[in-house]
Amino acid sequence: MRELKHELLPTRHTQVFHEDKDKMEFNAPHHFVVVPAGSPLVDQQIHYGRGGNSKKVTVKDFAGKLATVNFQLGPVTEHGANGVMNEDLIAMVITRLQYFQNSEFNCRENAMAITKLEEALMWLNKRTAEREQRGVEGTHEK
């Protein structure tokens, strides 16, 4: 696995990893692991997929893993719901920030983050609606 690096992602407390490019399917990473910063690596076998479609993939797992996120792999119409959607994670973060906003921890920065995350959901929903209109949603067609 490789570490997710982004100039705006702090790594003081946690680090995020995803599968190597040669293990990716459908042009994007689908499997993420969040660990405490500086966690030692451990080899482990993990099964990805469902039933007869599952395949054994060697990945790097981590001692003290905090979370694993497996995104939808392939179109739902072809593969069924088998993972988290981008929109699901964005909605989770919005909900968490809204709870902070309804407490003594409210602040302008959280309000701005909520607005921008809601905007991100709007753009993703717009893309889906346009793909549905063209009859290509749930396929690998543009």
UniProtKB/Swiss-Prot annotation:
Q: Which domain of life is it from?
A: Viruses
Residues noted as binding 3'cADPR in the record, renumbered to the chain:
Q72, G74, R96, F100, F105, N110, R127, R131, G138
Keywords (A to Z) from UniProt:
Host-virus interaction, Inhibition of host innate immune response by virus, Nucleotide-binding, Viral immunoevasion
Query: What molecular functions are annotated in GO for this chain?
Result: nucleotide binding
Q: Which GO terms describe its biological process?
A: symbiont-mediated suppression of host innate immune response
Respond yes or no to whether keyword Nucleotide-binding is given for this record. yes
* Result of knocking out the encoding gene: Knockdown decreases phage infectivity about 100-fold.
Which InterPro entries is this protein grouped with? Acb2/Tad1_hairpin (IPR056098)
Provide the domain comment: Upon ligand binding the C-terminus changes conformation, enclosing the ligand.
Quote the record's miscellaneous comment.
Answer: Although 2'cADPR has been crystallized with Tad1 (AC P0DW58) we have chosen to show 3'cADPR binding here, as evidence suggests 3'cADPR is produced by ThsB2 (AC J8CSK2) and 3'cADPR activates ThsA better than 2'cADPR (AC J8G6Z1).
Q: How does it assemble?
A: Homodimer.
User: Which family is it part of?
Assistant: Belongs to the Tad1 family.
| Biological function | Blocks activity of the Thoeris antiviral defense system (ThsA and ThsB, AC J8G6Z1, J8G8J6) when expressed in B.subtilis normally susceptible to SBSphiJ group phages. When added to phage SBSphiJ (which does not naturally encode this gene) confers resistance to Thoeris. Inhibits Thoeris upstream of ThsA. Probably acts by binding and sequestering cyclic ADP-D-ribose signal molecules produced upon viral infection (3'cADPR or 2'cADPR); sequestration prevents the signal from activating the ThsA of the Thoeris antiviral defense system.
What is this protein's name?
Answer: Thoeris anti-defense 1
Organism in which the protein naturally occurs: Bacillus phage SBSphiJ7
The beginning of the lineage is:
Viruses, Duplodnaviria, Heunggongvirae, Uroviricota, Caudoviricetes
